[in-house]
Design a protein with these regions (language model features):
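Extended amphipathic alpha-helical interaction segments
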Residues: 1-62
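A cross-kingdom marker for long, charged
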Residues: 43-116
C-alpha cells in the first residue's frame, strides 16, 4: 500500500504541474493530453517509487531498536494507526499537489518572460 499511495500521489502531483503550466496560454494542454502524458510515465514513477520507499525505510528505521520498530508496526495495524497514516498521506498529497501546481504556473510565467 505504501508504494501505491506514493505512486498515486506522484501521478496527481504531475497532473497538478501540468494544470499549473496550463494557466498560461503558451501551454494550452487539453486535460486528456495531460492525463495521457502522466499515465504514460506510471511504470517509471512506480519503479522510482519502489526504489525510494526501500531506501527511505532502510534509512528511517535503521537507528530504531527492534522493540521500537515492532511497536510502530503494531500501531500501524490498528484502526488508529491506519487513520493516522491516511491523515499523513492526505496532508502530504494536498501539499505536493499545491506546490506542483504553483511550480507549473511559475514555469509557465518564466517561459513567457523568456519569449518577450
Amino acid at each position: 500500500k505504501l508504494v501505491e499511495r506514493n505512486v498515486a500521489g506522484a501521478l496527481n502531483a504531475n497532473v497538478a504541474f501540468f494544470r499549473g503550466l496550463s494557466t498560461s496560454e503558451a501551454f494550452d494542454l487539453p486535460e486528456d493530453q495531460m492525463l495521457r502524458d502522466v499515465w504514460s510515465r506510471e511504470d517509471e514513477i512506480r519503479a522510482d517509487t519502489e526504489d525510494w520507499v526501500f531506501g527511505y525505510m532502510t534509512m528511517a528505521y535503521q537507528p530504531i531498536s527492534d522493540e521500537k520498530l515492532q511497536s510502530y508496526v503494531d500501531l500501524s495495524g490498528t484502526e488508529a494507526g491506519k487513520a493516522l497514516n491516511r491523515a499523513f498521506f492526505a496532508g502530504f498529497e494536498a501539499l505536493f499537489e499545491e506546490v506542483s501546481f504553483e511550480i507549473g504556473a511559475a514555469a509557465a510565467r518564466f517561459s513567457i518572460g523568456d519569449e518577450l
